[in-house]
Amino acid sequence: DVSFDRVPEHGVLGSAIATNFVNSMHVVFPEGEKFFVRSVRRFSKDIKDEHLKKEINSFCGQEGVHAREHQRFWEAMYEQGLKPDWFANFLKVTAFSGKYSYENVSKNLLNRLQPNLGDKFALSVTTALEHYTAIMANALFYEPMATNKNIAPQMLELLHWHASEEIEHKAVCFDVLKEVDDSYILRVSVM
C-alpha cells in the first residue's frame, strides 16, 4: 500500500500541466482496467490452454488491484480541491457502461454484423491498449526524468508498481485474442 499523504500539488516536474496529465490517468485507469477485464473474461470459457487460463486469472486480478489503487489516489486529488469523480462518471457513461457508450454501441452494432464481433473488437482494443501501456511502462523505467527528484515519491512508487505489472502481463490479451480469433485484420484494425 502506497501512502498518498501530502502529495505535492504539482508533483510531476513541478508542473501543473504534467501533474494534471498524470492525474487524468489516475481517473481514466479505474474504468479502463474494468473494461480490460470484461473484454478478456468474455472469452475465458473459450480458452483451452490451461496455462493461458491461469494467466487470464492473474491478469484480471492485477487489473482489479490497479483500478482500486488508482482510485485510491483520488483522495490526494480531493485534498487539492480537484474533483476526479465528475470526470470519471462522465467517462463511464460515455465510453464504458452507459446505454449509448462507445463500448455498448460498438458491441451491439458489430455483433449484428457477425456474432461476437463486437466482443472480439473490444478484446482487440484491449490488446492494443495493453501493448501501448507496456511500451509506456517500459519507458518509465528508462526515462531519466522519472526520478524522485522530478516526481513525488508516492506518485512514482504507484507508477513503477503499475508499470512493472503491465510489463509482466503484456502478452496475455494478445494470446487470448490469437486463440479466440487469429484474424490479422481484427488485430490491426484498432492499432
Report the location of each language-model feature.
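Non-heme di-metal
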Residues: 1-191
